[in-house]
Amino acid sequence: HTHVPTADTRILSNGTAYQTDIGMCGDYDSVIGMNKENSIMKFLKNKDAKQHFPALGEATISGIIVEADDSTGLSLKVERFISGGILKN
């Protein structure tokens, strides 16, 4: 899987808000949010890392906002959001 948000946000026919992949929250200039140099060296040297270090670049946060009917719990409205980092809207 890619950790990249998909653009298929919608409400399904029975009222469920849906998006295939919300995306990764964190620094996209990284290895799934971890320091890329450490992760690459671990892969190349086949070393078991005792500790992972988070990437310290600008983070991206992405997700969806769902408005639901209080009585049924069904989705009335759904919209994507992306803030910060390299995937800015």
What are these regions (language model features)?
Residues 2-54:
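Conserved beta-sheet core of the metallophosphoesterase superfamily
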Residues 38-89:
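A short C-terminal boundary segment appended to hydrolase-like catalytic domains
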